[in-house]
Amino acid sequence: MNDKRKILITCALPYANGYIHLGHLVEYLQADFWARFQNMRGNECVFICADDTHGTPIMVKARELGITPEALIAQSYKEHTQDFADFQVQFSHFGSTNSEENRLLCEYFYKKMQEGNHTRSQPIQQMYCNHDKMFLPDRFVKGTCPKCGAKEQYGDSCDVCASTYSPSDMKDVHCSLCGTAPVMKDSESIFFKLNDFKQYLEEWIPKHCSPEISKKMLEWFNEDLKDLDISRDEPYFGFAIPGTNNKKFFYVWVDAPMGYMSTTEQWAKSQGKTLKDIWQDPSREIYHFIGKDIARFHTIFWPAFLKAAEFRSPNQVFVHGHLMVNGEKMSKSKGTFIAARTYLNHLNPEYLRYYYSTKLSSSVDDIDLNLEDFTNRVNSELVGKITNLGSRGGQMLKKKMDGKMSVPDAEGKKLIEHAQKTAESIAAHYEARDFAKALGEIRGLADDANKYFDEKAPWKTLEADPEGTKQVITTTLNMFRMLAIYLKPVLPFYSQKVAKLLGEKDYVWSDLNTVLTNREINDYEHLATRIEADKVKAMVEEGRKINEEIQAAKKAASTAKPAAAPAPAAAATAGDRPAEIEFADFDKVDLRIGQVIEAEEIKEADKLLRLKIDIGEGQIRQIISGIKAAYKPEQLVGRKVLVCVNLKPRKMKFGMSEGMVLAAGTGGSDLFVLSADDGAQVGQRVK
């Protein structure tokens, strides 16, 4: 009989218009703990995630940066995957909802909805811009917040007071593109008849959600469920709905959960299998990890979609709480709204993994990242209790003795046996996602080992009883090894270093049954060092400064008048103008459309950026451009620009510059890189 479980787990998809922050990591880390634990136990656990890439906010952010939505999501994908990798989150596959697999799935689901008579059309009134001849998504509408009076806020939520509302509730409403007042106009929308699945969902939710989530979700069932508008009007970055002549697009909350399946399909293809081989396999367990703010989408809308398309639903939806910092909501002004990359600039990722594991349970309660407690617990527990065992025992054996273990003494054997018997209890806590309880038992074993080591005081018996001393150290190192095995789901790299110290391969759960004796160990390498308070302060300060810059940029954008043309430069006199040239002279200048592939600051230069630009036909040019004061490198990546490609290459102090990027302005921060319309292709000549 094969007891190996087949498991598929997913996390909510991070949105591709922003960075990963410490709040996001509450979810991704706990899912990673659980996936690693399952694989350690010999189960096959596939861990799937993807970037959520569609919707109006993506369009707006790309427009602000002057790049295409595709370039924005490519940039986010690179940043997100790097952040996850550096935090040791090990996905089986990380995809994107902007994939062919996802488009085909959306169309398939929609077809099944139609075949089951689960859709209907109805005209609804929406804001329409007569100037731009288009319906306006919420993010293309600006006005005064109806709650706090803040001006130039988007049509769905206020950046100042965080209120949500309808665009029709706002005052001084105008199109964010041209500044004109919109009118109300009918648009035919497509609705999913959610109430068709009311009885099914009432039975499904209690079986697949925790009691506290079930109770909350079933409050929606006191009356008929409202049909869900699954369509959005153009312009929209997403998938066009079949049969609408590219005028209607799937709402992002339709294609986002499909991303679980399309990314699973991509992984399945890499294994020579199909989506149905994985998703429809009745022996495979499927679990969703999500935050409580999106529980409704995953426990009402998503199961109904799956039922309509005749796909199985997940075994369980695991819902967690949010992150508080120092007992309060994450704050941008206080610097506690911390990006993953900001944390990584200052601290070891395993320290946060450890701290979160001491806080997380299977409940939906929020967890608190108290920065003082974080520092103290890492220093006293991970460094002082756990790592110190390996450090003291390993270094004494290697430096004071011959570097070879002996056998545990009688008391040590009992200590090790007790630690082994704790395995199933710790495993049960991991299985139940009660990570804090698992860590509590692990710390208890560390306390036992430290008490044993201190009472035996091997540093005192080294000369008088070398063999007895070696037995004490052997016991201590075996206990340290077991702690590293128990901690592997939480601290995978740390565990690998312990295995290397003891000359072993990567640990699996069954290695707990083994006791090391008469083994030569390797040189001890530092596994964890104390956190300095100054590093935590520096991290918070960096977070505060970054968020100040972001808020200043938002404020500048919100106070800027839509569609206002730049102030004209002072009129030049006839004598200031260059002499006229013949067309043949102008024709000598070869201007082409290029796309910025890479951009980086030249730290030694105040004004220069180093750009790598694709000018077509497989040619990548390096161009050194004096636009540093006006643009950050990340604002340029993916952008289509105008390039003079036949300018004679110029050897500069910082490398060869092979062309010129065209920009307008007076210089310094008053520079504006010239861009091409969306239809222009890389390599095309400007005429």
Swiss-Prot record:
Keywords: Aminoacyl-tRNA synthetase, ATP-binding, Cytoplasm, Ligase, Metal-binding, Nucleotide-binding, Protein biosynthesis, RNA-binding, tRNA-binding, Zinc. ATP binds at K332. It comes from Bdellovibrio bacteriovorus (strain ATCC 15356 / DSM 50701 / NCIMB 9529 / HD100). Coiled coil: none annotated. This is Methionine--tRNA ligase. InterPro entries: aa-tRNA-synth_I_CS, Anticodon_Met, Met-tRNA-synth_bsu_C, Met-tRNA_ligase_1, Met-tRNA_synth, Methionyl/Leucyl_tRNA_Synth, MetRS_core, MetRS_Zn. Zn(2+) binds at C145, C148, C158, C161. One of its GO terms (molecular function) is metal ion binding. Is required not only for elongation of protein synthesis but also for the initiation of all mRNA translation through initiator tRNA(fMet) aminoacylation. It is found in: Cytoplasm. Its main location: cytoplasm. Belongs to the class-I aminoacyl-tRNA synthetase family. MetG type 1 subfamily. GO terms for biological process: methionyl-tRNA aminoacylation. It catalyses: tRNA(Met) + L-methionine + ATP = L-methionyl-tRNA(Met) + AMP + diphosphate. Residues 585-687 form the tRNA-binding domain. Its EC number is 6.1.1.10. SUPFAM superfamilies: Anticodon-binding domain of a subclass of class I aminoacyl-tRNA synthetases (SSF47323), Methionyl-tRNA synthetase (MetRS), Zn-domain (SSF57770), Nucleic acid-binding proteins (SSF50249), Nucleotidylyl transferase (SSF52374). Binds 1 zinc ion per subunit. A motif ('KMSKS' region) lies at residues 329-333. GO terms for cellular component: cytosol. Homodimer. A motif ('HIGH' region) lies at residues 14-24. Its cofactor is Zn(2+). PANTHER family: METHIONINE--TRNA LIGASE, METHIONINE--TRNA LIGASE, CYTOPLASMIC.
